[in-house]
Amino acid sequence: MEETNQFKAIDSRFVYISISSIEAIKEFVSTVTNFACDATLCSGRYIVDAKSIMGVFSLDATKPIKMVLEVGRNGVDDRDALCDAIDKFIVD
């Protein structure tokens, strides 16, 4: 009987973003929801879905926020396109 590996290696990428106003948060979430990849925001001990406006509003926006990007469940890898679309929010 041959064993199969049920777990796939996760290819994660991350960038830091700055979204310091209500309008910026609305624009950011609206843009991110148009992409298939999974996007998570990490700030301190909090982790939220970047496609959730309520989740994003709950984070401390006074500091850069780490955004982790992974290929979506459908297998579409549009992470580079997402980074291009949110370029104005990305900080070094």
Residue locations for each model-derived region?
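Structural preference for solvent-exposed beta-strand-turn elements
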Residues: 2-5, 37, 47, 76-82
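Short glycine-/aliphatic-rich beta-strand segments at the starts of folded cytosolic domains
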Residues: 9-18
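N-terminal intrinsically disordered, cationic/polar leader segments
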Residues: 18-20, 33, 40
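Conserved residues at beta->alpha junctions
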Residues: 19, 43, 73
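Structural motif corresponding to alpha-helix initiation and N-cap regions
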Residues: 22-25, 50
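Generic non-transmembrane alpha-helical segments
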Residues: 27-35, 85, 89
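Amphipathic, hydrophobic secondary-structure cores in small proteins
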Residues: 40-70
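C-terminal structural segments of small proteins and small subunits
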Residues: 64-92
